[in-house]
Amino acid sequence: KSVYTFGSPRVGDGVFAEIYAERLGSKTYRLTHGRDVVPSVPNTLLGFRHVPTEVYEDRNGNITIGDGSGEWKGGEDHVWRRYSVSDHLYYLGEYICGCNS
């Protein structure tokens, strides 16, 4: 059994992230895509941290597995980037924010 999240914001402080990593880190995959804005909030200056492990999908669909730290930033899209709301709407080539009927 595993936990998969798509475009998750930071949800706890450093202590939370450490405890989470000890208990579920090897079973958690936190997918991020391109320049998705949501994983960048709340800011780390406020004490929030990501849980591991990031699985980064670039805008061409290439996948990179993170280094196991919650705050790893994969790919060139993560370096002083402009954030994108539209990158939050698509993961693994699928529209994830609504129903298509």
Regions picked out by a protein language model, each given a short descriptive name:
Residues 1-101:
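Serine hydrolase/lipase
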